[in-house]
Swiss-Prot record:
Residues 1-25 form the signal peptide. One of its GO terms (cellular component) is extracellular region. This is Evasin P1243. It comes from Amblyomma americanum. Salivary chemokine-binding protein which has chemokine-neutralizing activity and binds to host chemokines CCL1, CCL3, CCL3L1, CCL4, CCL4L1, CCL5, CCL7, CCL8, CCL13, CCL14, CCL15, CCL16, CCL17, CCL18, CCL19, CCL20, CCL21, CCL22, CCL23, CCL24, CCL27, XCL1, CX3CL1, CXCL1, CXCL2, CXCL4, CXCL5, CXCL6, CXCL7, CXCL9, CXCL12 and CXCL14.
Length: 123
């Protein structure tokens, strides 16, 4: 009787393992795979500082690079940005006093799209 119960239990356990796989084997495969895990994206997972505007449109990055946990991160292509001079950046305040060139990030550069808007630091 005991051997029958043991046999049924072991068979059920084997069937479960076959259907669902071993947890340790599955985790091991996922941990070593770079196909599904973007390490660059993980290092750049903190929020980037954006500038506000008076138009009520989406907040935009100042340029296309930002630091996150000691890593220089690049915004993805097509991401909205402001293209400002160093002098404009130094004079930014928390109220709208700067006319900012609007653009989109392309390969790490904020490419102007010909429009301007008042931008300012978020409080």
């Amino acid at each position: 009787m005991h051997s029958t119960i043991a046999y049924v239990f072991v068979s059920a356990l084997a069937l479960f393992a076959a259907l669902h796989g071993s947890t340790s084997a599955r985790n091991h495969t996922e941990d070593n795979s770079t196909e599904y895990y973007d390490y660059e994206e993980a290092r750049c997972a903190c929020p980037a500082r954006h500038l506000n505007n008076t138009n009520g449109t989406v907040l935009k990055l100042l340029g296309c690079h930002y630091f996150c946990n000691g890593t220089l991160c690049t915004a993805p292509d097509g991401y909205p940005c402001y293209n400002l001079t160093a002098q404009q950046v130094r004079t930014l305040t928390t109220y709208p006093n700067t006319s900012c060139a609007v653009g989109v990030c392309m390969k790490g550069t904020c490419v102007k799209n010909g429009t301007m808007e008042q931008c300012f630091k978020t409080p």
